[in-house]
């Protein structure tokens, strides 16, 4: 099967980006072309395999992915971030599983959630942000009514169906990706740091009827070029996260729900998640963080009342 590899980047990943390029040209099933969508205003990196082609686009995690991909001539696209290492047979393996399961979208499980420390996993579950599921023979990742997600704690098969996943790497048809109109979700680029674009993209695929498959034990490594965790960035990420959760919950959880009873459950779930998050900040004496979270929720609610939001097509 033929495919095109497309990469979104700022051109600043350095050696991590070089490892991605090297692993792409070393694939047992190599791409027909490597297209790199780089943000306007950034320099083309020196790292190269001398076959990649650059296209300048508007900056943004969504803006650099929600494209028409007119340059792509193949049926399939392998979507990538710029800081991954790919085993030589991974693309061939992903295509094989796509055919085996009859899936529309295939994505590797990159983040080992079960390997987090117990205390972190406990707090994530208590907050409604992320929780483990046990003895689930069907699902990998699922979206929760708190706007968080749950994951399969003990996967034993090579792949499971999912409602969301990490967006650093996935394979699908170009037509299937275009069908979800990801450009409608550019509201996520409003913040300095985009949060949740992966969850929105995958869940929109799921709600559109596309069958998503999570592949386990792939050997893909997330080299994580974005390692800066300054106090300023931490505050910005917290703010963006709570703006995102407010909007995602309303757009993708609450509005599509037809049952009045379940809508009440939705309200209770997000209310619990926000109350827990705010209370934790108070208990820790982090009044600055409390204010950041509260202000972010207010901004999210303000956007829900905006004309721009009301004009977005509804998620069914």
Q: What residue ranges belong to the model's regions?
A:
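Short aromatic/hydrophobic "clamp" motif used to bind/position activated sugar donors
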Residues: 77
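N-proximal low-complexity "stem/linker" segments adjacent to membrane-targeting elements
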Residues: 1-26
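Active-site-adjacent helix/loop segment of glycosyltransferases
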Residues: 211-285
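Catalytic donor-sugar/metal-binding loop of nucleotide-sugar-dependent glycosyltransferases
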Residues: 178, 193, 199-221
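Short, flexible, basic/aromatic active-site loop/helix in glycosyltransferases
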Residues: 126-162
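Acidic donor-binding loop at a coil-to-helix junction in glycosyltransferase catalytic cores
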Residues: 165-169, 188-203
């Amino acid at each position: 099967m033929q495919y095109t590899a497309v990469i979104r980047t700022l051109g600043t990943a350095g050696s991590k980006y070089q490892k991605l390029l090297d692993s792409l040209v070393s694939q047992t099933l190599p791409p027909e072309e490597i297209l790199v969508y780089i943000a306007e205003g950034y320099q083309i990196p020196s790292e190269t395999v001398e076959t990649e082609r650059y296209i300048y686009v508007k900056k943004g995690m969504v803006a650099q992915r929600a494209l028409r991909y007119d340059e792509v001539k193949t049926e399939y696209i392998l979507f990538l971030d710029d800081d991954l290492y790919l085993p030589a047979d991974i693309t061939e393996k992903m295509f094989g599983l796509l055919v085996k399961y009859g899936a529309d979208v295939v994505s590797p499980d990159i983040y080992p959630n079960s390997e987090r420390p117990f205390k972190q996993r406990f707090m994530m579950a208590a907050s409604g942000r992320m929780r483990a599921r046990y003895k689930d023979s069907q699902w990998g990742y699922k979206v929760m009514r708190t706007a968080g997600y749950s994951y399969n704690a003990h996967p034993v098969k090579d792949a499971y169906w999912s409602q969301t996943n990490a967006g650093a790497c996935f394979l699908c048809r170009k037509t299937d990706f275009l069908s979800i109109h990801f450009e409608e979700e550019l509201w996520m680029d409003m913040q300095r740091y985009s949060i949740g674009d992966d969850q929105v993209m995958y869940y929109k695929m799921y709600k559109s009827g596309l069958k998503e498959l999570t592949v386990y034990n792939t050997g893909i490594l997330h080299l994580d070029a974005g390692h800066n965790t300054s106090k300023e960035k931490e505050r910005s990420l917290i703010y963006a996260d709570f703006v995102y959760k407010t909007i995602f919950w309303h757009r993708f959880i609450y509005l599509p729900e037809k049952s009045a009873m379940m809508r009440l459950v939705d309200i209770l779930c997000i209310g619990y998640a926000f109350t827990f998050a705010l209370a934790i900040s108070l208990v820790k004496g982090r009044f600055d963080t409390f204010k950041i979270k509260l202000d972010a929720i207010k901004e999210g609610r303000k956007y829900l009342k905006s004309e721009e939001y009301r004009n977005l097509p509804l998620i069914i």
